[in-house]
């Protein structure tokens, strides 16, 4: 297929047009008074959202060059959301403002490479000042404030997230699910839970709830398949003498072994339950080791030279309470040594930091949470499917932003943090580097101006008023007042501001230093010719039908 090439100003102007259209669609969602955007879906009802990245993801433009510009900035919004959970609209507004200011200067003859260098230096200096002005997230109240702001000022969601974080800690896993009704709920699973239920319903101890509960129990951990009773008979005899219940976690238990266990359970000879080991392959081995560390046991594995026939009671893990239903097993109050658990947690954190796979990272974080204290499930309720999706997106964003705040600290919100940081930056640059520096200094006012405009105020006036002051002074767009942002709880995670600025500068630099674009020429489909109508000449006599 033939390709078209566009050069210099012609290419950059079309790229800018794409960025402008994306920016205009996304900017309306910014701030506490941001508006909704209605998005047509290929099937089903349209979706309504106030989430910048959800709007950006839907945008495809007909002009191929303009679309390339839009797609690059869309990528920035997505990357910012992935890394920090929020700040997608901030990143888009900043990218547009930097590109707009930069394009004006480059069209006037500035050197794009020198301009880029100045922009990078300015961004780095502003980020350093942001870090200095940040403060650590203190208690539950500040976590509630961050979550509330990220959930578009929904205090209810903010409180749910703060409660969840308080229950499971900053390393705990918090998941978001759809509730059956219209009320929001929070469920917390204490201890370690994995998705394997009992191998036979005959292990149940509570017929009403269909659960098996074992108190002060031993836990046998093995990566072997148990099919013969003689494999575990010596160990069963030893545990029976102590009169304690036993949970067997193995690759599988089948045939004669499972039948014998069930029969002895029904006769009351053994207080026992059996489940399959969680996970698959290497992940299963690691999860068995996690359970062993948590319960103070040892995985009986032939790789380690251990066999079930020769296993001793000392190899068994111990737990205060174990609850098993048809789908899940929960181990509460594992009796492992705290320093062993801490070492294991540190090891998993190192693996999380070094892995490049999102899937592996997610699974490692789940393991970390199970060792660290538990899992919280926020169940989001809504009256309709459209509202449910929009609300669930907001909760996901708020959760990520809150984790970012706990991780790196918080700065004043409402777009004021960037302005405050820029006020403290004084770089002495020359030539076109200075031009790049000044571009960033002007562009960082854009988020505050846009928040004010969306709330019905003059953006320029608000920016000037905020610039006159120092410290934590900023603009509360909810009521139009100038306040101490920390005292009012108007705060943003440092990570969100940092990544939004870094990503915006990165994509703007790429666009400004673009000298040519290459795209496919759309071929117009030829309209098929009309068939010969000659045989219809006799229709002239139809005039009499009038």
Curated annotation (Swiss-Prot):
Please provide the record's keywords in A-Z order. ATP-binding, Chaperone, Cytoplasm, Isomerase, Nucleotide-binding
**Gene Ontology terms: biological process:** protein refolding
Q: Provide the catalytic activity annotation.
A: ATP + H2O + a folded polypeptide = ADP + phosphate + an unfolded polypeptide
Where is it found, in Gene Ontology cellular component terms? cytoplasm
Q: What does this protein do?
A: Together with its co-chaperonin GroES, plays an essential role in assisting protein folding. The GroEL-GroES system forms a nano-cage that allows encapsulation of the non-native substrate proteins and provides a physical environment optimized to promote and accelerate protein folding.
The family assignment reads: Belongs to the chaperonin (HSP60) family.
SUBUNIT field: Forms a cylinder of 14 subunits composed of two heptameric rings stacked back-to-back. Interacts with the co-chaperonin GroES.
Q: Which NCBIfam families match?
A: GroEL, PRK00013.1, PRK12849.1, PRK12850.1, PRK12851.1
Q: What is this protein identified as?
A: Chaperonin GroEL
The source organism is: Helicobacter acinonychis (strain Sheeba)
Gene giving rise to this polypeptide: groEL
